[in-house]
Amino acid sequence: MNLIEFPLLDQTSSNSVISTTPNDLSNWSRLSSLWPLLYGTSCCFIEFASLIGSRFDFDRYGLVPRSSPRQADLILTAGTVTMKMAPSLVRLYEQMPEPKYVIAMGACTITGGMFSTDSYSTVRGVDKLIPVDVYLPGCPPKPEAVIDALTKLRKKISREIVEDQTLSQNKNRFFTTSHKLYVRRSTHTGTYEQELLYQSPSTLDISSETFFKSKSPVPSYKLVN
């Protein structure tokens, strides 16, 4: 090649050649185009909605919200997760293609929040249902904290290895966190919940004789002391 015909070749060739590995290229493409599935159930999701505006502009991170779990690789849980919603959340996570990531946003998602002390219907930590990659505490977290969590997740993706991802997929990825909880005495001191177990019989279950007998007037001699 004649360098006289291409005098700028030696100056631009060093900037046009990229040397990398397939693993790093895959990580770079995934961290630059995260497609989140927004699972918001409470007030924490309102703070995440602030990122859509022009002040924070979460599009610069390549985030494209999706409405289907089959098209998402990131699920962001924000808010309280109840026992009734737990199977739906696990089903959404299982429908996401690998590799997939989870961000737990807010105190209610991480530990149950103010419902964790004495609630019969609240999941005390979403990591009991699905594995969590980044914990974002707060009540609620600010939009700047959400951006910091996304940055930490991008750094985690950049250090991943394909072989490690394959091994993690074959293992049981649920119940990844063992909480150090202390058993305390229940705060239920009354019997106010027992009345819910008693249901008065309907009029269809009562015979006509018993019904009219109960409706009969009280004799006058029973009114006298």
Curated annotation (Swiss-Prot):
It is found in: Plastid, Chloroplast thylakoid membrane. The keyword Plastid applies. Its cofactor is [4Fe-4S] cluster. InterPro entries: NADH_UbQ_OxRdtase-like_20kDa, NADH_UQ_OxRdtase_20Kd_su. GO terms for molecular function: 4 iron, 4 sulfur cluster binding; iron ion binding; NADH dehydrogenase (ubiquinone) activity; quinone binding. Keywords: 4Fe-4S, Chloroplast, Iron, Iron-sulfur, Membrane, Metal-binding, NAD, NADP, Plastid, Plastoquinone, Quinone, Thylakoid, Translocase, Transport. It catalyses: a plastoquinone + NADH + (n+1) H(+)(in) = a plastoquinol + NAD(+) + n H(+)(out); a plastoquinone + NADPH + (n+1) H(+)(in) = a plastoquinol + NADP(+) + n H(+)(out). Its EC number is 7.1.1.-. It is a peripheral membrane protein. The keyword Plastid applies. GO terms for cellular component: chloroplast thylakoid membrane; respiratory chain complex I. One of its GO terms (biological process) is photosynthesis, light reaction. Binds 1 [4Fe-4S] cluster. NDH is composed of at least 16 different subunits, 5 of which are encoded in the nucleus. Belongs to the complex I 20 kDa subunit family. This is NAD(P)H-quinone oxidoreductase subunit K, chloroplastic. It comes from Lolium perenne (Perennial ryegrass).
